[in-house]
Amino acid sequence: MTNIRKTHPLLKILNSSFVDLPAPSNLSAWWNFGSLLGVCLAXQILTGLFLAMHYTADTATAFNSVTHICRDVNYGWVLRYLHANGASMFFICLYLHVGRGLYYGSYLYSETWNIGILLLFAVMATAFMGYVLPWGQMSFWGATVITNLLSAIPYIGTELVQWIWGGFSVDKATLTRFFAFHFMLPFIVVALVMIHLLFLHETGSNNPTGIPSDPDLIPFHPYYTIKDILGFLVMLTILSTLVLFSPDLLEDPDNYTPANPLNTPPHIKPEWYFLFAYAILRSIPNKLGGVLALVLSILILVIVPTLHTSKQRSMMFRPLSQCLFWFLVATLLTLTWIGGQPVEYPYVIIGQVASILYFMILLVFMPLISIVENYLLKW
């Protein structure tokens, strides 16, 4: 008799996605991050749902409701810190996942790649709005500064900002709508994830060599389910260690002061996972130029497939491209560090050099070095 998982209308979809899915036999640990992102998303939606049961989206009570969750709700502090640090784990996995795609040439599956970029924007928007909800000093001023960037758009900028704020400043209306969007966006992310997987399963996974793996495929279960479970355990161990031993490690101390429109914090900065983009924004003295650079720092990923000039897909056998890739990683880490520093010498000039390098590596050096490699290999 045929197994029910292969005949049942719902189960056969799951079966073809997670059980009998043909997968390349040589996938490395870098292919774990897709499933880790799924776990992060599920954990964020669950903890967020329970937090929303106790949170009030009102300027007068938002800060106190978060304090109430931590002090009075059973294991509320665990929920709150799992959610806050879970976001950090989410972004670590996201950046490693994108980095894997860049290194191994997975971006040549352009539909999957472009849906992935949409997902990245959606998750970033969700995280930004979530950071506003505790209504601390950094929540309020972060929301004010980042939404104000839209005023750089010619003609409609000022009206657009006031429309988003729901008034003439960040206030109750802003907080309420941000809570609504923060609750809604993760479900849009789930829908996008399904489309992402749909397109991925049309082509099948790439593999570290970048060579078609059709002659050598193995079933996803049990080979990769067991590898994924190991990944889950490692990630959950790191997350629980962070939550239970130093939950505020990645937080900003300013956010433990209730929002005060009359008192500006000395250094307004976003969460650590946005610092690289914030550094690029700050490195350009012109407001509109900075906003464009900020958007392009992520949007540049869209044209990466077009700039692929190598005859090989993966960087596995391309040592020159590998050096350049790790140089790009170092540049991003430098930008992350600069984003958290005050706007003064020498940080400004380091940020400007790193920003120029970031765009130059992706737009100029990567395609050129690939052409050089082709020439050296007589291709």
From Swiss-Prot:
One of the GO BP terms on file: mitochondrial electron transport, ubiquinol to cytochrome c
Entry GO CC: mitochondrial inner membrane; respiratory chain complex III
Binding site for heme b b566: H97, H196
Location of the protein in the cell: Mitochondrion inner membrane
Residues that coordinate or bind heme b b562: H83, H182
Cofactor(s) recorded in Swiss-Prot or TrEMBL: heme b
Membrane topology recorded in Swiss-Prot or TrEMBL: Multi-pass membrane protein
Residues annotated to bind a ubiquinone: H201
Membrane spanning residue stretches: 33-53, 77-98, 113-133, 178-198, 226-246, 288-308, 320-340, 347-367
Comment field (misc): Heme 1 (or BL or b562) is low-potential and absorbs at about 562 nm, and heme 2 (or BH or b566) is high-potential and absorbs at about 566 nm.
PANTHER family: CYTOCHROME B
Protein name as it appears in the record: Cytochrome b
Lineage of source species: Eukaryota, Metazoa, Chordata, Craniata, Vertebrata
